[in-house]
From Swiss-Prot:
It is found in: Gas vesicle shell. The keyword Magnesium does not apply. Induction: Constitutively transcribed at low levels, repressed by argR. Residues 113-127 have a biased composition (Basic and acidic residues). One of its GO terms (molecular function) is structural molecule activity. NCBIfam families: PRK09368.1. Residues 72-144 are annotated as: Disordered. This is Gas vesicle protein A1. The gas vesicle shell is 2 nm thick and consists of a single layer of this protein. It forms helical ribs nearly perpendicular to the long axis of the vesicle. It comes from Streptomyces coelicolor (strain ATCC BAA-471 / A3(2) / M145). It comes from the Bacteria. Keywords: Gas vesicle.
Length: 144
């Protein structure tokens, strides 16, 4: 009697850890999670987790496709507490400097108005022209 060994029918056969690791690195395994907890517009908690088991090329292709190369860049970046404090300080200083400049301009304007008013009242009261003062060098010459 002859014995025929049983042939394996089905899947690709046995594969070792090396084959599995090569497949994962080639295809890539990326677990990407972004969680943000806000209360009344104030960010309380921000969790950004990215677990990548892939080759560098695979990860860079994934990040470029998902536009996740730099998480904190772009127009959708929320300002953090240092940014908010800096903006408030800057806007407060800008408001104070605008107030100081407008106050200075108002003071100068008032001074010019007052000078005009004083000059106009002097012109009305004095009908004769003012005498011209001689220069000090001419006076010395005349005295000699």
């Amino acid at each position: 009697m002859t014995v025929v060994p049983a042939q394996q029918t089905g899947g690709g056969g046995s594969s070792g850890l090396y084959d599995v690791l090569e497949l994962v690195l080639d295809r890539g395994l990326v677990i990407d999670a972004f969680v943000r907890v806000s209360l009344v517009g104030i960010e309380i908690l921000k969790i950004d987790v990215r677990v990548v088991v892939a080759s560098v090329d695979t990860y860079l292709r994934f990040a470029e496709a998902c536009n996740r190369l730099d998480l904190e860049a772009g127009p959708r970046k929320d300002p953090g507490l240092p940014d908010l404090v800096g903006e408030m300080t800057e806007s407060g200083a800008r408001g104070k400097s605008k107030g100081a400049l407008s106050g200075a301009a108002e003071t100068i304007s008032d001074a010019f108005k007052q000078a005009r008013d004083d000059g106009g009242s002097e012109r009305e009261t004095s009908s004769r022209p003012r005498a011209r003062k001689a220069a000090p060098s001419r006076r010395k010459e005349e005295q000699e």
